[in-house]
Amino acid sequence: MHKYEKTGYLTDNFKIFHLIDSDMPEIDFHFHDFHKILICLSGNISYCIEGRTYDLRPNDIVFVNAGEVHRPIIHDTTPYERIIFYISRNYLEDYQKKDNDLALCFKSAHKNQSHV
């Protein structure tokens, strides 16, 4: 069985990044111990999550559940602009109410294998 590297860190309840890259190195499959939301703003990008590949278009929103193996595939030097949210699992659980599951978008993406 292949071992994937855990990457990234989250010392707060959440972090938000706005990134633009036009010459990115190849990124290997990896996972995080927090949830990730990615909003694709531009770029010629595919995103692989748990064995499924999604071709992204501007304004696509990608949900990556904590622990899911994923990686972006950057196809060319078109600027890859995105907003990324890292969200602690505990943070969502702390604010969850009986009739309001804040992690439902991540659970549904995983269950339905439809992350975009």
Regions found by a protein language model. Give the residues of each.
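Tight coil/turn sites that cap or link beta-strands
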Residues: 22-24, 58-59, 67, 88-90
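Short acidic-glycine-tyrosine-enriched beta hairpin
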Residues: 51-65
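A hydrophobic/aromatic-rich effector-binding and dimerization subdomain
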Residues: 1-16, 69, 73-116
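Conserved short histidine dyad/triad with adjacent acidic residue
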Residues: 15-32, 44-46, 69
